[in-house]
């Protein structure tokens, strides 16, 4: 099951406590022993409800979500400094499986859940454009989805066929099980039919391989792209926050928090989940290079 949070107020408990304190103050005119006892109880309850959280929140999965998780972790630490967020970059498939088998509090996936991935719920916290990257010296500036399909399946093998210099196209992709690979292949309709020259285990490795080879083409998360490679337009549309959010850029996918349907999250895990899915996290997500869904 997939869902998209529109807004959560993870500090609602604090608001409730403040309201309770205000009501207690209004009733302070009655100075009986019973009133004093009630006020003391209210104060204790308020202190308990706003007590700082502690403990660990175990997350893991998508390697493409590394920058987003790092930013969210840093922002959350300003609110709950005694909570530790761990992150194990094992790939989207492993993240979903680990949420299902209760190994992780929150699994991370850079693709939507599949029909057979049951017992868990996916919550979209951000969107990510999958940038099509070429070497900075390449003359190619734009490719269509159909051209990408033909290139990655081996129907088009020379750069001259798509406006580049003469030279055999070198296809660089991610390893099987990668959420980025799954997203790219699903969107471009090349599932399990790509003729990769290299299958690499991390987004950074793909970027480095394309940077080093003037004949290479690959794909990588928008949030990870720097100035060492060139992102081509797809169908004339640049891969950017605006085009991902408005849907005009075709090669995009969600960043998903995956939780187990049969487990109640710990207080600290729920607080981190709510923070990540709230408007308070929008600037952090944007700083990490992804597109926030809640603003």
Question: Where are the model-predicted features located?
Answer:
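Exported/periplasmic ABC-transporter solute-binding proteins
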Residues: 3-5, 27-103, 107-295
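N-terminal export leaders
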Residues: 7-11
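Hydrophobic helical h-region of N-terminal Sec-dependent signal peptides
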Residues: 15-19
């Amino acid at each position: 099951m997939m869902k998209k949070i529109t807004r959560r107020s993870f500090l609602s408990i604090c608001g409730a406590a403040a309201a309770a304190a205000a009501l207690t103050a209004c009733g302070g005119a009655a100075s009986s022993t019973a009133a004093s006892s009630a006020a003391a109880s209210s104060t204790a309850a308020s202190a308990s409800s706003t007590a700082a959280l502690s403990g660990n929140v175990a997350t893991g999965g998508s390697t493409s979500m590394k920058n987003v998780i790092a930013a969210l972790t840093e922002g959350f630490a300003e609110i709950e400094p005694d909570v530790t967020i761990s992150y194990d970059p094992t790939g989207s498939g492993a993240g979903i499986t680990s949420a299902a088998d209760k190994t992780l509090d929150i699994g991370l996936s850079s693709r939507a859940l599949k029909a057979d991935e049951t017992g868990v719920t996916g919550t979209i916290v951000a969107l990510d454009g999958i940038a099509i990257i070429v070497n900075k010296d390449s003359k190619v500036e734009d490719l269509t989805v159909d051209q990408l399909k033909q290139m990655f399946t081996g129907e088009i093998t020379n750069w001259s066929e798509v406006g580049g210099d003469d030279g055999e196209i070198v296809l660089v992709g991610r390893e099987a099980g990668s959420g980025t690979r799954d997203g790219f292949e699903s969107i471009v309709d090349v599932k399990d039919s790509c003729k990769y020259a290299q299958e690499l285990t991390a987004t950074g490795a793909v970027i480095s391989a394309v940077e080093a080879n003037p004949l290479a083409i690959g794909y990588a998360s928008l949030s990870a792209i720097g100035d060492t490679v060139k992102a081509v337009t797809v169908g004339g549309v640049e891969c950017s926050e605006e085009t991902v959010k408005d849907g005009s850029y075709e090669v995009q996918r969600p960043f998903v928090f995956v939780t187990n349907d049969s487990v109640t999250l710990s207080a600290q895990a729920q607080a981190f989940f709510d923070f990540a899915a709230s408007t308070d996290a929008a600037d952090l997500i944007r700083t990490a290079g992804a597109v926030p869904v809640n603003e």
